Design a protein with these regions (language model features):
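Cell wall/extracellular polymer interaction/catalysis modules
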Residues: 1-37
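Basic/polar, cationic surfaces and motifs that engage anionic cell-wall
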Residues: 1-12, 16, 46-50, 55, ...
């Protein structure tokens, strides 16, 4: 098993309220980016449904230089209708993220929780301060 030191939260950078599946995100990454699979390990749908992406045992493709020891979690949304960054998480997404993060912190107690924007300066993703919001998990 690979070491897990970080859990990194992302958004799909899609408009508020627009549904996208893990299969769609996988296609964006495989066909659009030329990757071999979806970059994230989990996708959180608008209704809070959790879909799996890459297996945890496999390094993701979500933050350059930090994939080997992290888990990538993405929620669907993160932009307003004009494609400006906005925290668009539904109540169901917030609850699902919190539940998943608690599970992951139990499984990987030394892992810290971060937003993508903490590693990639200039990015708004995940459109909220994940490190601050989840600091006490």
């Amino acid at each position: 098993m690979r070491p897990i030191n970080r859990i990194i939260i992302h958004c799909t950078a899609t408009p508020e309220g627009r549904h996208h599946t893990a299969a769609e995100v996988r296609q964006w990454h495989v066909k659009g980016n030329g990757w071999r699979d979806i970059g994230y390990h989990y996708v959180i749908q608008l209704d809070g449904t959790r879909e799996t992406g890459r297996p945890i045992e496999t390094a993701g493709a979500h933050v350059r230089g930090h994939n080997a020891d992290s888990i990538g979690v993405v929620y669907v949304g993160g932009c307003d209708a004009a494609m400006k960054p906005k925290d668009t998480r539904t109540d169901a997404q917030k609850a699902a993220l919190l539940c998943l993060l608690r599970e992951l912190r139990t499984a990987y107690p030394n892992a810290t929780i971060h937003g993508h924007n903490e590693f990639d300066i200039g990015k708004a993703c995940p459109s909220f301060d994940a490190g601050k919001e989840y600091a006490t998990i």
